[in-house]
Amino acid sequence: MQRKIPRRIVDGVLLLDKPSGMTSNGALQTARRLLNAAKAGHTGTLDPMASGLLPLTFGEATKFSQILLDADKTYEAGVKLGTTTDTGDADGNVVAEHPVSVTREALEEVLSRFRGEIDQLPPMYSALKRDGKPLYEYARAGIEIEREVRRVTIHDLELIAFSGEHFSMRVRCSKGTYIRTLAMDIGAALGCGAYLDALRRTAIGDFDAARAVTLEALEASPAAMRDGLLEPVDALVAHFPKVELQPAEAAAILQGRELRKPEDGQGSVRLFCGGRFLGVGEWQSGSLRPKRLIATQTGQ
């Protein structure tokens, strides 16, 4: 019988370029196996049909996954006009077809209506859960579940290309935005219907897909060098100001005590001691308090 290799402690963030046709969980499990990591998670589901940036967190980095879940996302999307599907994307069954007579000017005018704060109805084919079960399971069983409209923000919406019955767009949006729903709503506003036929996530917060690695590149790397493809844990909080602590201060913070500091900061900060990342602290009423700390023996 082949002995099972024990999982090891791995801490960091893998900026993965997920291929189209793979689930986010499938990508996570493949990367986890290649790194032989004990603990792993991802920072928000990317649809199977979509490709692009999927940050995977390992070990202590999983404590900060929520930061990327809450971050703005940027996508490049392809939209087919004149056809609607039951899923809102190319994987679904066609439910209606309409003639298309759309000019670039008309499309630009409709796109302008979707910039800023908008309301969206989450699609039935989504990972949102009701009574512990994702909506897509109800949808596959032919059951329609009542959903609440969500207010989301489209920060930027740019038309990249247009060719009569198809266009591509670049979207930077708030968390919780469904690009499939955006494509369908644009099609409805144009009077011809539409579905999403391509989607690539190009950025999350300050992370860009240009820095991402593929599963093929990860697998091709020697096992001993794969950890070198990971970003350090503190990369997830690089936008917070840095505070360097003295050893005695660090000891107090690690024991859960607050510090009175001469400087009066605001909000969340990255905590370091001797160049080692300790976690995230927060200024409150002139005191620096621990907010989320990492296991110090594995801090990067």
Swiss-Prot record:
SUPFAM superfamilies found in the cross-reference section: Pseudouridine synthase, PUA domain-like
Keywords: Isomerase, tRNA processing
GO molecular function: RNA binding; tRNA pseudouridine(55) synthase activity
Any GO BP annotation: tRNA pseudouridine synthesis
Cell cycle listed as a keyword: no
UniProt-listed Pfam families: TruB-C_2, TruB_C_2, TruB_N
EC number: 5.4.99.25
Signal peptide: none
Active-site residues (renumbered): 47
Catalytic activity entry: uridine(55) in tRNA = pseudouridine(55) in tRNA
InterPro entries in alphabetical order: PsdUridine_synth_cat_dom_sf, PsdUridine_synth_N, PUA-like_sf, PUA_sf, tRNA_psdUridine_synth_TruB, tRNA_sdUridine_synth_fam1_C, TruB_C
Role description: Responsible for synthesis of pseudouridine from uracil-55 in the psi GC loop of transfer RNAs.
HAMAP family assigned to the protein according to its UniProt record, in alphabetical order: TruB_bact
Protein family: Belongs to the pseudouridine synthase TruB family. Type 1 subfamily.
UniProt protein name: tRNA pseudouridine synthase B
Organism from which the protein derives: Azoarcus sp. (strain BH72)
